[in-house]
């Protein structure tokens, strides 16, 4: 079964070669749920995303339309985009919700239409077990919350106190 990725690349101005005056910009469409692992070959891991990201050079435009997903996978993608050598422009097509909002923060520039939405919320999980297990889940969620606030704080320059998620 062929993998169905939640992203795909398009190289702008097909057939045009890179020059110092007109470098080619690659376009990444990141659509759908962000996942850490593929269970049914319908998601792709961050490692495969990294391989494709690093397969080209130059500036990139990321068109983002995602309801979010796994925050740890989103964190990996955020880090890959932040470490990318070219300029990263994030364009929120319609929705950057939940973990996708973390990916958006990796852009050197973030652009949204007046109709686009960004949803930021407290991280969620499913937990089962006794009171000790529940406390561990609460502590883990608190750590995740603080880590994603780091991305928002770094991008906006707003103090942590401004984020009431």
Annotate each language-model stretch with its function:
Residues 1-99, 106-165:
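N-terminal organellar transit peptides
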């Amino acid at each position: 079964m062929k993998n169905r990725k939640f992203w795909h690349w398009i190289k702008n101005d097909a057939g045009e070669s890179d020059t110092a005056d007109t470098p080619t910009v690659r376009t990444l469409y990141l659509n759908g749920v962000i996942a850490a692992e593929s269970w049914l070959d319908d998601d792709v891991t961050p490692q495969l995303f990294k391989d494709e990201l690093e397969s080209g050079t130059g500036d990139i435009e990321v068109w983002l339309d995602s309801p979010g997903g796994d925050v740890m996978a989103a964190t990996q993608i955020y880090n890959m985009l932040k470490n990318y050598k070219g300029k990263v422009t994030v364009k929120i097509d319609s929705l950057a919700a939940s973990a996708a909002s973390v990916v958006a923060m990796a852009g050197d520039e973030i652009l949204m239409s007046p109709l686009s939405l960004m949803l930021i919320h407290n991280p969620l999980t499913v937990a089962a077990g006794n009171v000790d297990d529940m406390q561990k889940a609460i502590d883990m969620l608190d750590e995740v919350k603080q880590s994603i606030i780091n991305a928002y704080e770094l991008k906006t320059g707003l103090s942590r106190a401004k984020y009431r998620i």
